[in-house]
């Protein structure tokens, strides 16, 4: 079953908040991913977890390519299989 915008963005916010040692409420969907200062290996691991949760393949660099949580979520929504 496809996930909603709120489900996907919430999942990403929770993971980034955890690893960046922030409260989820401190993270906005339009903040550039690079501002969270998470290393590329960690972001690849988050992407791998996200792939498993979504049941779809993602580019290991999707967060860097899309730039923000909001843009990443939009891309996922547009590319989920119906």
Question: Which residues does each predicted region cover?
Answer:
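Residue-level recognition of oxygen-bearing side chains
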Residues: 32, 68-71
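Thiotemplate assembly-line natural product biosynthesis machinery
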Residues: 1-25, 74-82
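Phosphopantetheinylated carrier protein domains
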Residues: 39-67
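Short polybasic/polar patches that bind polyanions
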Residues: 18, 34, 52
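N-terminal sensory regulatory modules of PAS/LOV and PAS-like folds
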Residues: 24, 33, 63
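N-terminal helix-turn-helix DNA-binding core of bacterial DNA-binding proteins
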Residues: 30-36
